[in-house]
Design a protein with these regions (language model features):
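Loop-to-transmembrane boundary segments
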Residues: 2-11, 448-464
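Structural motif
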Residues: 24-26, 53, 82-90, 158-162, ...
Length: 573
């Protein structure tokens, strides 16, 4: 879409924020011992003032570089876009204002506490606003046919087989068949796995069609292909092999643990009515897993602990994806941006991913590669496939749309105790952020003018957002303010601050606790038992680990050998 609408919203947001910030700073009293001409004094000899000024100058330089880049790429430059780019300096201006105010304020630490809270929570307030403004691409109501329907779709499932979870794999296959795409390609690493998957999928299809025979609208013409031509256990390679077998306008890439609803395709495809949309993401949800049965050989406490552990990890996995739902719905509404279109299920125009340049880059993505210095970089990457595709789409002039509603929901399982790999997944996801966000911000650069709000609301925060350290810093800073020291009810204020920080973690996760069957999770895992907040703090430490190991290039949880044994066992049986 044209850059102007996103830029206008960006300028509005980044006008309101500094105005409110300056207004708040003006309310904070100055030190009465300072002379009048000292008020808001700019003293470059002060290291904090010099540092904030340097950041502001650097941001102006960065904006000029962005303008040069846009010109070199023949991007359309309008007065609105040029003006909007300079609003990227607003955060640096707000920092400088805080430094100058802190130099003259009566309660310097209150200024810094205010700055810290504003820095942490402005994006939450902005995200809430845009979340409420979301609009779904609805199906046509005028009787005219949609641009695309399910027969225009090829579904590609990169898989190593069902492993231990045949039941989930079966539901995934049946859900795809219910939506009636033209073709489903199961792309496996090698022919022997394809030979094991093929009879399983055929049996699932046979039983599914037998159950549906006699019902209304039961014409089944979905073609199923199982291929092992990838010759490599790598999701990117397997996906490309599946893409090669697509002859439809739309390719739907699906994880082998993703289960759709019966109206999934007909609800998501209307997003492509906008010819600028090339990539579509959906709402994600996590299945509530049954708790383990009591073991008579264990004590009552041990049985309770086993149930609590199972429920905890299932809930943590659910909250992880629910947070993502909130983020993508809000950012996509704000300026069309997303941190990533999830690879669990995504729809894309076939012409984008059948391009030879795309395939070559997709299979040979390196990070920190500097050819002029002889640095090959890290790669080719195995993970990060969905981030790469998201970046590719916007860098090639197409838009992204999130279809967020019940019918456009993909359901999966996370936090299974019998196949526990959630921590490994968290590590992989965090490494992906540390690899891909800097690439998007400083190599691609497109989002600075295409998704300007998302730059500051999503891409930068995901790099530095470690709640353990920010929350401790906020509490410590508050206790050093004169306001706190002089208060007669110090610990009531401190308790209120802790409660606000605690409850702020509910903003993006509340959707999970609303259904009746999930309401008890609020008590057991959020409040008053702070299991989820404690996990969030533990994740902050995990994030430091992933920063230090971002170059580790693996894909946790895709155990070919285990899956192969399972499949061969089923085949023999």
């Amino acid at each position: 879409m044209p850059y102007e609408p996103a830029m206008i919203r960006f300028m509005v947001v980044f006008t309101i924020i500094p105005v409110l910030w300056l207004l708040w700073l003006s309310f904070l009293p100055n030190d009465t011992l300072l002379t009048v001409d000292k008020t808001w004094n700019y003293d470059v000899s002060d290291w904090k003032t010099l540092g904030a000024t340097t950041i502001l100058v650097a941001m102006f330089g960065w904006v000029l570089q962005l303008l040069f880049t846009m010109t070199a790429r023949s991007e359309r430059l309008s007065a609105m876009v040029v003006t909007g780019l300079f609003f990227h300096t607003v955060p640096a201006m707000c920092l400088l204002a805080a430094v100058l105010k802190a130099n003259v304020a009566k309660d310097t630490q209150l200024v810094w506490f205010s700055a810290l809270m504003a820095f942490r929570y402005w994006r939450t307030l902005v995200a809430i606003f845009f979340w409420t403004q979301y609009k779904l691409s609805e199906k046509r109501v005028d009787g005219q046919p949609e641009r695309y329907n399910s027969a225009d779709c090829t579904v590609v499932v990169a898989t190593v087989g069902p492993g231990k979870n045949v039941e989930l794999f079966t539901r995934m296959v049946e859900a795809i068949l219910t939506n009636k795409p033209k073709r489903v390609v199961f792309s496996t690493p090698k022919p022997s796995i394809a030979d094991s998957v093929r009879p399983l999928v055929s049996e699932i299809q046979k039983q599914f069609e037998a159950r549906k025979t006699g019902q209304a609208d039961t014409v089944f013409d979905t073609e199923i292909i199982c291929t092992g031509e990838a010759n490599k256990q790598d999701k990117r390679t397997q996906t490309v092999q599946g893409i090669k077998m697509a002859d439809t306008p739309i390719v739907v890439m699906v994880d082998d643990s993703a289960v759709w609803g019966p109206k999934f395709l007909e609800t998501t495809l209307p997003a492509f009515r906008d010819e600028k949309v090339g990539f579509v993401g959906t709402r994600k949800w996590v299945e509530r897993l049954p708790l383990p049965e009591d073991d008579p050989n264990l004590s009552q406490y041990q049985n309770f602990a086993a149930k609590y552990r199972a429920g905890f990890w299932n809930t943590i996995g659910a909250l992880y994806l629910v947070r993502h739902n909130f983020e993508v719905r809000a950012s996509n509404t704000a300026d069309g941006g997303v941190f990533c279109v999830s690879g669990r299920t995504s729809l894309i125009l076939t012409k984008i991913i059948k391009d030879e340049e795309f395939i070559n880059k997709f299979l040979n993505e390196y990070i920190w590669a500097i050819s002029s210095l002889g640095m090959e970089g890290v790669g080719p990457l195995k993970a990060d496939d969905d981030n790469f595709i998201t970046r590719w789409v916007i860098n090639h002039g197409m838009d992204v749309k999130i279809q967020y509603c019940e019918d456009a929901t993909m359901t999966t399982q996370l936090g299974r105790i019998d196949q526990f790999k959630f921590i490994d997944q968290c590590i992989r996801w965090s490494r992906t952020t540390m690899r891909q966000n800097p690439m998007a911000l400083f190599v691609d650069q497109t989002m600075w003018w295409k998704w300007p709000i998302s730059v500051w609301m999503v891409y930068f925060p995901w790099l530095y957002n470690a709640a353990l350290f920010w929350d401790i810093l906020a509490i410590w800073t508050f206790t050093t303010t004169a306001f706190f020291r002089e208060s007669a009810v110090q610990y009531r204020w401190l308790g209120l601050l802790i409660l606000v920080i605690w409850m702020s973690k509910l903003t993006k996760t509340v959707a999970w606790f609303l259904p009746r069957q999930n309401q008890s999770d609020f008590f057991w895992y959020f409040f008053p038992i702070p299991a989820y907040p404690l996990f969030v703090y533990g994740h902050s430490l995990l994030k430091i680990y992933t920063v230090a190991t971002f170059w580790v290039n693996d894909w946790s949880g895709r155990a070919q050998d285990e899956s192969q044994r399972q499949l061969e066992g089923m085949k023999r049986n």
